[in-house]
Amino acid sequence: TRHIPVQMVTLDEDRQHGLARGAFSFVTKPTTSEGLEDALNRIKEYAAPRRRRLLVVEDNAAERMSITELLGHEDIDISTAETGAEALTVLKSLPYDCVVLDLRLPDMSGFEVLEQIRDHEKLTDVPVVVFTGKELTAEEDARLRSLARSVVVKGVESPERLLDETSLFLHRVFDGLPPEKQNMLKKLHDSDEDLQNKQVLVVDDDTRNIFALSSVLERRGMRVLTA
């Protein structure tokens, strides 16, 4: 059911929480009949058969190729950008369904890109998955929590997680993926049932790890405490 677009009708303070868990869009309470009609029209337009658009923002050519090969299939069109400025230009030229963003870019930081996306009226709801190996400070961690939908830390199982996170925000149909990608996702989710409603304490002095682990565990149905 992850491919089904969910339209939230909620309070504004719940917006980021819902969007980070894959909600398609939201309408702020109290709403009007016109607001609900616009929301339904957005879902109707989004659900129409078409190839999804994904933008990969990464200055390293080998990393770009690796990400493109990992995520690519006939159901999506993948574009790439090497700089923050190029990424913003591309995003403003065509509507995109999801962005994979590295925080280390040659012309500006990934944080600046995220802030410009947030502040642009037509881009503010584009889901951005940060894919980075950068060690985060506490301040950077707090900024990411308010700007990005998800953070995937480069390392063990990061390809599976990146495929999983982008599939969620692109609303990709599991059965439509090639067998090797289905197997990657199945392996990642096989143990989820045992984790539902369990409480876990995450203790780490690296806020990057805390952010990444908390996001993954909460999405698996766990209650997360951090220290």
What residues fall within each predicted segment?
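Hydrophobic/aromatic residues positioned on beta-strands within the core alpha/beta folds
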Residues: I4, V9, F131-T132
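C-terminal output helix
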Residues: T31-N41, E86, E139-R143, G155-L168, ...
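Short hydrophobic/Thr-rich beta-strand motif most characteristic of the beta2 strand and flanking loop
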Residues: D75-E82, V90, G221-A227
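Acidic catalytic/metal-coordinating carboxylates
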Residues: T83, S109-E115
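Charged docking surfaces used in two-component/phosphorelay signaling
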Residues: M65-H73, F211-R219
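Active-site beta3 strand of CheY-like receiver
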Residues: L94-V100, L105
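Conserved acidic carboxylate
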Residues: T10, E58, D204
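The feature encodes the CheY-like receiver
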Residues: P106, T124, L136
